[in-house]
From Swiss-Prot:
PANTHER family with a match to the protein in the record: GLYCOGEN SYNTHASE 2-RELATED, PTHR46083
Stored InterPro entries: Glyco_trans_1 (IPR001296), GS/SS (IPR011835), Starch_synth_cat_dom (IPR013534)
Pfam families referenced in this protein's UniProt entry, alphabetically: Glyco_transf_5, Glycos_transf_1
Protein name stated in the entry: Glycogen synthase
Enzyme Commission code: 2.4.1.21
GO process terms (BP): glycogen biosynthetic process
Enzyme type, top EC level: transferase
Organism whose genome encodes this protein: Chlamydia trachomatis serovar L2 (strain ATCC VR-902B / DSM 19102 / 434/Bu)
Entry function: Synthesizes alpha-1,4-glucan chains using ADP-glucose.
Length: 474
């Protein structure tokens, strides 16, 4: 089976969030048994094109967007995946000067890229074309209007239903879409506005989200009734498939950044397992200037953005100070106000023996925190899937989550973690923290059962890939 993914992010090359990681994991798992290709735009200022001798092909092609255009497709293989980078030769201003993945004119830029990608797919042929989020939503309409050879199915995955690609009808008219297919993207209440996600929903054969609970939640999203109508119309061709993590990348067995490597097999003698965690904790506390007297260790490894529940993060700081356990927060702030608030907290708590706030993300330090911490807190307002809770469980670190989206699908309260429900209830959140800390301190048998359940949780990529294959073959 030949599968082509179109997206804006792909973690080995460029990423801004979980989409790039999820696509990489899925493509890697599919490539084990199927011809798998990922098509993304080339950002010359953000990553370097592979050397010519490492490329497997260089193709010139034409596409239509705001007139006849020319592009070059550079292809190479990475871990069995064919990666194709598009350079828009006659529209260089769209990507060549971009210093970030996302800018203010994304709808126009991504539609131009989508037009080039669709032209390439029509030329190359594919059995499955798999789109990721609204960014390449135009591809669905273009391929429905003019299918490629051997095309069996167009699949759309919603990594974040909150982002939809609102744009103008004028931009859709710049493509080769005819009036019928433009109408699939058009808003009835405002015919001059088109929504790339809306058209992609109608023009795709199957729609997936990145967790079963998130699939249910988006059917109850009434923030735009026309988008709600579109997703409701597709509900019989909608399925939530939980993302997996690459256990060859994330795991304490071989992680070179740890003070002490360990395996889940050590848990046959729990004391040995916890001794390994303790060695990592000691090394981390020394690095961060924390006191080992404060236990357990709770961490938050997250972007600090409204989606991630920053109001709960502040409550966690107060709770840690009141209850004498360690809290480590690491992540980048999004938004000036949040940055100012957390920078002030960082400064005021710089000499605290049990709280550290680190506002510059480091992959190495994050891995050391995963291994050292006893718990990871993820109080998200919404979470389509979430990967950090699964990574935490791989390291024997118990997740404390708000029961939403993929967090609800992966964490069972009192079984392999702790959870709360109300997105605005500090009392419920603090009770969850207290229950987790008290269990750790006073009920060692229950704590061991919870950690064992974490270590036995299945989060491999192959499970997710097999579920996508079921959809491809339907």
């Amino acid at each position: 089976m030949k599968i082509i993914h179109t997206a804006i992010e792909f973690a080995p090359v460029i990423k801004a969030g979980g989409l790039g990681d999820a696509l990489y994991g899925l493509a890697k798992a599919l490539a084990a048994n199927h011809t798998t290709e990922v098509v993304i735009p080339l950002y010359p200022k953000l990553f370097t094109l592979p050397k010519e001798q490492d490329l497997c092909s260089i193709q010139k092609l034409s596409y239509f967007f705001a007139g006849e255009q020319e592009a070059t497709a550079f292809s190479y293989f990475y871990e069995g995946i064919k990666v194709t980078l598009f350079k828009l030769d006659t529209q260089p201003e769209l990507f060549e000067n971009a210093e970030t993945i996302y800018t203010s004119d994304d709808a126009f830029r991504f539609c131009a890229f989508s037009a080039a990608a669709a032209s390439y797919i029509q030329k190359e042929g594919a059995n499955i074309v798999h789109l990721h989020d609204w960014h390449t939503g135009l591809v669905a309409g273009l391929l429905k209007q003019q299918p490629c050879s051997q095309l069996q199915k167009i699949v759309l995955t919603l990594h974040n239903f909150g982002y939809r690609g609102y744009t103008t009808r004028e931009i859709l008219e710049a493509s080769s879409l005819n009036e019928f297919y433009i109408s699939q993207y058009q808003l009835f209440r405002d015919p001059q506005t088109c929504v790339l996600l809306k058209g992609a929903l109608y023009c795709s054969d199957f729609v997936t989200t990145v967790s079963p609970t998130y699939a249910k939640e988006i059917l109850e999203d009434y923030s735009d009734y026309e988008i709600h109508d579109a997703i409701t119309a597709r509900q019989h061709h909608l399925r939530g498939i939980l993302n997996g993590i690459d256990t060859t990348i994330w795991g304490p067995e071989t992680d070179p950044n740890l003070a002490k490597n360990y395996t889940k097999e050590l848990f046959e003698t729990p004391s040995i397992f916890f001794e390994a965690k303790a060695e990592n904790k000691k090394a981390l506390y020394e690095r961060l200037g924390l006191s080992l007297e404060h236990s357990p260790c709770v961490c938050i490894i997250s972007r600090i953005a409204e989606q991630k529940g920053p109001h709960f993060m502040k409550q966690a700081i107060l709770h840690a100070l009141e209850n004498a356990y360690t809290l480590i927060i690491i992540g980048t702030c999004y938004g000036n106000q949040l940055h100012e608030e957390f920078a002030n907290l960082q400064e005021s708590l710089a000499n605290s023996p049990n709280v550290r706030i680190l506002l510059t993300y480091s992959d190495v330090l994050a891995r050391q925190i995963f291994a050292a911490a006893d718990m990871i807190c993820i109080p998200s307002m919404f979470e389509p899937c979430g990967l950090t809770q699964m990574i935490g469980m791989r390291y024997g670190t118990v997740p404390l989550v708000r029961a939403t989206g993929g967090l609800a699908d992966t964490v069972a309260n009192g079984i392999n973690g702790f959870s709360f429900f109300n997105p605005h209830d500090f009392y419920e959140f603090r009770n969850m923290l207290l229950e987790a800390v008290t269990t750790y301190r006073t009920n060692h048998d229950k704590w061991q059962h919870i950690v064992r359940a974490c270590l036995n949780f299945s989060s491999d990529l192959e499970t997710a890939a097999n579920k996508y294959l079921e959809i491809y073959k339907q």
